[in-house]
Amino acid sequence: MKNKVSEPSEAYQIISKYGNMTGNDQVLTLAAMKGLKTGLFSDVISLTGFSRDIVAGWLDISSKTLMNYEKQSKYLNPASTELLLKIILLFEKGLKVFGDRIHFTRWLKKPAYGLGGVIPIEIMRTSGGVDLISDELTRIEYGDLA
């Protein structure tokens, strides 16, 4: 199983795979309410390049539990589905702002001035945290760094 996106086109394939579920907040919420299979989890690992343990930590689920879900083809709960879909949107924006995954993930691991010195990856455990990071990316995109 691949764990990392090797080419930019592969990243955009993953992003476009979920594009019909992330068009707006209403569509995303309705998709999340249904839950998605654990393939979404694997796609987020591939897209982000982060380890299974890190991504599982965002969902507050152990890697072992997620492996069992994958074996049983279970669906993720609505909150986990929503968070992972928002992370896909976040990476779409991050790739646009930073140009590639390497620079974006490097930024995610360092204190962000616009977030009061918080390290972005540390607040990706909540939907609100992902929203704050997305807002910060918008400010960076438009040059509003103050």
Model-found features: residue ranges?
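Non-transmembrane "mature" sequence context
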Residues: 1-146
